[in-house]
Design a protein with these regions (language model features):
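N-terminal Rossmann-like NAD(P)+-binding subdomain of aldehyde/semialdehyde dehydrogenases
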Residues: 60, 66-181, 209, 351
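Short, Lys/Arg-enriched N-terminal segments with co-localized hydrophobic residues
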Residues: 39, 46-69
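ALDH superfamily catalytic-core signature
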Residues: 77-82, 86-89, 204, 282-412
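Conserved C-terminal structural/oligomerization subdomain of aldehyde/semialdehyde dehydrogenase
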Residues: 67-72, 80-81, 107, 395-533
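Residue-level signal for inorganic ion chemistry
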Residues: 214, 273, 338, 389, ...
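N-terminal, intrinsically disordered charge-dense segments
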Residues: 3-28
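Rossmann-like NAD(P) dinucleotide-binding subdomain of oxidoreductase/dehydrogenase enzymes
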Residues: 171-312
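Positively charged N-terminal leader segments that act as targeting/secretion signals
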Residues: 11, 24-46, 65-66
């Protein structure tokens, strides 16, 4: 009982003091003033009474047991925890103020100035693609160096090529005949949140679109990828500042924590949040009360219809699932196959070193591969190789195994492997017909992937159209690997991006691949014309 009392006592004391201190800070008053004049006095008084009672219970317990091994938390320790949180908020304020100063210095930048600096970022990304890829793999223990080189190059070269002719400064469109003119202005200070799965490439991408739209950016890096992300941002900063950019147009949180990232996203002087991460982080971004562009979870299905080119379809899926060990969120998490070609598809996967789990091995994966609290892949397994994941789950597979496949029948909490996997693992379903295939794909999207991506392999244009209308996904990929198809610009003509909107399906504000234009305020000048009655 004493332990329970002490935990409650310590936690309440911290939270009450922190709550009042933060309220006082945001109101610009002393904590005592907030307690007396605000609406917190009754709550504070009540909790203090409770704390006193708990203190007495602890003391009495110790006297009865004669146990002095659990000293009370000192007032100094409590004050220190509050002060530390205050320091975090203060440091964020400093970063944001510096960012606004840089924003003002960029006010006179022309389209040519901005494009020149974007080209500098492109060169940094290309020249350091391998160095940063190796650093990311070494730090996070996830993915493949060669594939991260490709992603860094994509974030630099492909992204720049896609938007180099995009007008983002000043007058971007004028129609004299219609009497309309559009003027672009930067949104302001961006809070850029990055994931552990695609760390360095996301930094390059977000820095590029921030500069292209003449905004400043402050990054909150994932703690498990802090070093490689800081190095990426430093290289970009050094090169762009040398080329004429303001010193603080790009900054980052030096000591990452959930508190610091939350403080950044909620800072009143930050204009927009650009968040890439798990569903919790994206939800937090959308709860800030300001514009936010977030990326929801994937869990995308891929349907191999009976008229599909089997060899190409299987090649595409294996390529997609092995690329950076399946960490692009658009990659196939499940494959649904028409019964007429199921055996042929399975044989094709086996030829490409895909290991099919036995019934008892599926149970081991259900127990170890999926985090029961979150209902998705366990963190330590995301982005690991198929062989390593099997080992972690207690399953022995051949050393040349590329992908792990679980033949499955259901979707939802009772079928753990039907969730998002972010690794070279997928579930395989047999469908009696296209109607059942559509139903399975829809169920998979509804179980953690709404709005993201769905793929189909077929030669039947009518089926493609029906599939597109039926799926609650913002990207419908036809006859292509989903990982590289979803990001655009490689296997299709979608806008290249490393931030993929999922629309209202996934509680996102946009449904397309995010670009620099999403970071602009666009004003419309409308000339008078004769009124139409």
């Amino acid at each position: 009982m004493e332990k329970i009392y002490k935990i409650i006592y310590s936690q309440w004391q911290k939270e009450v003091i922190a709550y009042i201190a933060n309220k006082a800070k945001h109101k610009g008053k002393a904590a005592s003033c907030v307690i007396k004049k605000g609406g917190f006095y009754p709550l504070f008084f009540f909790l203090n009474v409770v704390i006193v009672v708990i203190e007495k219970l602890i003391t009495r317990n110790k006297q009865e047991a004669g146990d002095e091994r659990m000293p009370k938390q000192s007032t100094t320790e409590v004050e220190k925890s509050v002060r530390t949180e205050d320091e975090i908020y203060h440091n964020i304020d400093i970063l944001v103020n510096k960012s606004h100063e840089a924003l003002a210095q960029m006010d006179d930048f022309s389209q040519e100035d901005v494009d020149k600096l974007c080209q500098v970022i492109e060169k940094v990304g290309e020249d350091n693609a391998r160095y940063l890829a190796q650093m990311a793999v070494d730090e996070t223990g996830r993915g493949k160096v060669e594939d991260k080189v490709t992603k860094n190059t994509y974030a630099a070269q492909t992204i720049w090529e896609s938007m180099k002719d995009m007008k983002t400064v000043g007058v971007i469109e004028e129609d004299k005949q219609e009497g309309l003119m559009k003027i672009a202005e930067p949104i302001g200070v961006i809070a850029g949140v990055t994931p552990v799965t695609n760390p360095t490439s996301t930094v390059i991408f977000k820095a590029m679109i921030a500069m292209k739209s003449k905004n400043t950016i402050i990054f909150g890096f994932h703690p498990q990828a802090q070093k490689c992300c800081v190095e990426t941002a430093k290289l970009i900063k050094e090169a762009t500042v040398a080329a004429g950019a303001p010193e603080n147009w790009i900054q980052w949180i030096e000591h990452p924590s959930l508190t610091a990232t939350t403080a950044l996203m909620n800072n009143p002087k930050v204009q927009i949040v650009l968040a890439t991460g798990g569903p919790g982080m994206v939800k937090a971004a959308y709860s800030t009360g300001k514009p936010a562009l977030g990326v929801g979870p994937g869990n995308g299905p891929s349907y191999i219809e009976k008229t599909a080119d089997i060899e190409q379809s299987v090649n595409d899926i294996v390529l997609s699932k092995t690329f950076d060990n399946g960490m692009i969120c658009a990659s196939e998490n499940s494959v649904v196959v028409d019964k007429e070609v199921y055996d042929q598809v399975k044989e094709a996967f086996l030829k490409r070193h895909c290991y099919f789990l036995k019934a008892d091995e599926i149970k081991l994966f259900e127990e170890h591969f999926i985090d029961p609290r979150r209902g998705t892949v366990a963190g330590p397994m995301a982005g690991k190789s198929a062989v390593k994941i099997a080992e972690m789950c207690g399953v022995t597979v051949p050393a040349d195994t590329q992908v792990i496949v679980a033949e499955y029948s259901g979707v939802g909490p009772k079928y753990p492997l039907s969730a998002e996997k972010l690794s070279p693992v997928f579930t395989l379903y047999k469908a009696e017909n296209s109607a059942q295939a559509f139903k399975i794909c829809t169920d998979l999207l509804n179980y953690g992937g709404r709005g993201h991506t769905a793929g189909i392999h077929t030669q039947n244009s009518k089926v493609i159209r029906k599939f597109a209308f039926a799926m609650s996904a913002c990207r419908i990929l036809v006859n292509s690997p989903a990982a590289l198809g979803g990001i655009g610009g490689v296997y299709n003509n979608m806008m290249p991006s490393l931030t993929l909107g999922t629309g209202s399906y996934g509680a996102n504000s946009v449904s397309h691949n995010i670009t620099a234009k999403d970071l602009l305020n666009i004003k419309t000048v409308a000339m008078r014309r004769k009124p139409i009655l």
